[in-house]
Amino acid sequence: MPKDFSRTLRVADQVQRELASLIQNEIMDPRIGMITLTGVEVTRDYTYAKVFYTTLGGNENAQLAEEGLKRAAGFLRSQLAGKIRLRIIPKLQFVYDESIERGIKLSRLIDEAVGKT
């Protein structure tokens, strides 16, 4: 497993904050709707960034949101170039984050198991 570098983590955090602001204020695509950015992973050379997101409607809205985000990726990247001072602005890859849904399912299973005993 590669070692995490503090600068890479700081850049990922800044990319997440700027993208959240841009998506909320600049993107008017109705497919995107209410999404939450849960994390960003940037490669060490800053060429790629995986942006993890969740949607308010769960899996039903995830596919539509992914299409909208992929369509807006070029615009978001160009806007990031004006807000972040990096020599290379990372290419954005949007990935639906299922960890919250899995956590809710596990919590329900635990509650059911505790309730049966």
From Swiss-Prot:
InterPro entries: KH_dom-like_a/b, RbfA, RbfA_dom_sf, Ribosome-bd_factorA_CS. PROSITE patterns: RBFA. One of its GO terms (biological process) is maturation of SSU-rRNA. Pfam families: RBFA. Coiled coil: none annotated. GO terms for molecular function: ribosomal small subunit binding. It is found in: Cytoplasm. Its main location: cytoplasm. One of several proteins that assist in the late maturation steps of the functional core of the 30S ribosomal subunit. Associates with free 30S ribosomal subunits (but not with 30S subunits that are part of 70S ribosomes or polysomes). Required for efficient processing of 16S rRNA. May interact with the 5'-terminal helix region of 16S rRNA. Monomer. Binds 30S ribosomal subunits, but not 50S ribosomal subunits or 70S ribosomes. Belongs to the RbfA family. This is Ribosome-binding factor A. It comes from Nitrosomonas eutropha (strain DSM 101675 / C91 / Nm57).
